């Protein structure tokens, strides 16, 4: 799956099957621009916000925000109330956890570096190791544990990933890339 940063070997969506189905049923094209996700991430489905509040929360000028809001409204991602406030389409609120999996036969250090980059948008990463020695497994486990990430070797789980969340806008950006990948192919669920 092409992601916001890098190309993980595998992606796992845990507990988000209903989100993926609702996202597809919404009929909204994937929103892959980081700016779009920055705006959407400050919106809520149940609470409409004024343009001024959105601009302040995103850190943009109202002039920079208006074309993005207009585009998102045209796409069906944002609803505008009769009073001029905005709320996000509920189908765009991520549910579940996305894990980026990086498989390496030997170079666990490269897998950890790649996994750390994926954590900018994924809930966490897991390194999948092939047949390596005990010293390599121990060193990889130390690095991965420090990150709160996961390590899986040929003998099973060495370190299980801990729950974490990236910044809301980056997380939404990752979920939108996941949706784009599944909209173009049939994922293994």
Indicate residue ranges for each PLM-predicted region.
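Conserved catalytic cores of phosphodiester-cleaving nucleases, focusing on short active-site segments
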Residues: 9-22, 96-105
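Charged low-complexity interaction tracts in eukaryotic proteins
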Residues: 77-88
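Basic amphipathic alpha-helical segments that dock to polyanions
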Residues: 43, 54, 67-78
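Short acidic, hydrophobic short linear motifs in intrinsically disordered regions
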Residues: 45-58
């Amino acid at each position: 799956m092409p992601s916001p940063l890098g190309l993980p070997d595998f992606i796992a969506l845990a507990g988000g099957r209903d989100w993926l189905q609702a996202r597809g049923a919404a009929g909204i094209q994937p929103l892959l621009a980081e700016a779009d996700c920055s705006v959407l991430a400050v919106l809520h489905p149940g609470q409409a916000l004024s343009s001024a509040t959105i601009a302040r929360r995103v850190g943009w000028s109202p002039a920079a925000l208006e074309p993005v809001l207009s585009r998102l409204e045209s796409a069906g991602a944002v609803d505008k109330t009769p009073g001029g406030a905005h709320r996000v389409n509920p189908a765009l609120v991520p549910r579940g956890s996305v894990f980026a999996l990086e498989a390496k036969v030997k170079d666990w250090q490269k897998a950890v570096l790649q996994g750390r980059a994926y954590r900018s948008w994924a809930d966490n990463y897991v390194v999948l190791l092939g047949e390596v020695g005990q010293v390599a497994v121990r060193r990889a486990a130390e690095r991965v544990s420090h990150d709160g990430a996961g390590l899986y070797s040929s003998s099973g789980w060495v370190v299980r990933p801990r729950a974490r969340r990236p910044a809301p806008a980056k997380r939404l950006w990752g979920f939108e890339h996941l949706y784009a990948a599944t909209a173009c192919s049939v994922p293994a669920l």
